[in-house]
Amino acid sequence: MAAAQGPVSCEPDTRVLGTYLSSVPIGSMGSVGSLVEKQDLSPLELRAPLGGTRGLRQPDGLLRKGPSQRELFGYLHGAKKETRSERKHQASAACYKRDYESDRENRSPERCSREHHRGADFSKSSLPERGRFDKCRIRPSAFKAVTGKGLVSMQGLSSSKGQKLSKSNGSLHTLLSQSTTAAPQHGPLRTHLLHAISLDEASDSSHNSIQSFPSYGSRLKPAQSQFSASMGHINHIGGSLDRVSRSPRDPLAPEKAPLSCKSMATLSRLQSPGEPPPPYEFTYSLEDAVKQLEDRLKETGGELRQLKRSLSETEDPFAQAFEDKQRLWLDELEDLKQMYMARLQQVTQQAQRGQRALQLQLYKAQQEKKRLQEELSMQQCQCEETKLRQSQGERVSPKLEETKWEVSPLLSLSVATLQAVQPGWGSGSLL
């Protein structure tokens, strides 16, 4: 079956499946058909024929399904006419837009519109080489049981009004796995959505059987397990989801890596009606993770070096001024030390000179003392001698007085005698 797998928000609806079971005649035999794949195109390129992109996200946080099979078939065949219901649906969904990365410039809508002016070319010359994975190729379909109705376009298989095609084969499971990782309590919701999309795919496969060729008259009733359409599946209308899932991403920020703009219309075949397809998970190699960590480490190291450099540049003037002041203070301290050492030496010399002078004076005083002591001793000796002499004179004076008194009468007698004897001699001598 050809269905675009992706996150859906609608409830599972099995009415189409019941309708298909009731409408399949017994012994009807399908026809051989083929489906030509086109090159990868972005959702913006689908906007011109489809009338705008679908809203990618619903209010409950889940992604919507991609375009319906009718719209995809109309784009592949270059259909320009749109039904009234499609216009209404396109007008209601025209408000949803999405910004894509700048590296998608080569796949911009303007450039694609200039390069692809016409619709799909299904001629033999347009078919790619065999084995080329990135280009369209024809896949034969198996013989399946289809109804015997008239010619119906291969892609004119519209799903029910409450159903929408999913975005890609693995986007639903990828987003559900991411939402389960972020919020583990939503496990039952994920299981319910997986079951709903599997039932939806089964109903789409039963309802969208290929009816583009007349049926044959075989009356063999096909088994109910063979409800998948005999149209193959389109892998590369937006098939870059596989390449995106295998491309290296940042393991630290997986939410920053948007899905490829071409994964909007990815169609893949449902392998079993009862089980969901394997999810597409984003895998990161160890080398990429190590490289990302090394890059971030280098960036952090560069920022640290820049901070150190700026800090050193900021501190350099203050450090230089402090060093200059410290050097000046050391020089002043050394000068003060030298000055006070010189003063101390000078004072010491002065003290030594004063000490020597005092010692000399003391010696002189001691010598003078000795001299004075000697003189004193001499004076004392002389005084004692004088005292002795005085004492001796005091003892001689009375004797002299006595002698005077004894001699004076004698003298007077002698004189009188002489006068008497010689009267003239005595008077002349006395005169």
Swiss-Prot record:
InterPro entries recorded: N4BP3 (IPR033571)
Asked if Coiled coil is a keyword of the record, the answer is yes
Query: How far does the signal peptide extend, from start to end residue?
Result: none
Q: List where in the cell it is found.
A: Cytoplasmic vesicle; Cell projection, Axon; Cell projection, Dendrite
Print the keywords alphabetically: Cell projection, Coiled coil, Cytoplasmic vesicle, Developmental protein, Neurogenesis
- Sequence ranges of Basic and acidic residues compositional bias: 79-89, 96-127
Give the principal location in a single coarse category. Answer: cytoplasm
Q: Does the keyword tRNA processing apply?
A: no
Q: Which family does it belong to?
A: Belongs to the N4BP3 family.
Instruction: Enumerate the PANTHER family for this protein.
Output: NEDD4-BINDING PROTEIN 3
Q: What is this protein called?
A: NEDD4-binding protein 3 homolog
Q: Which organism is it from?
A: Gallus gallus
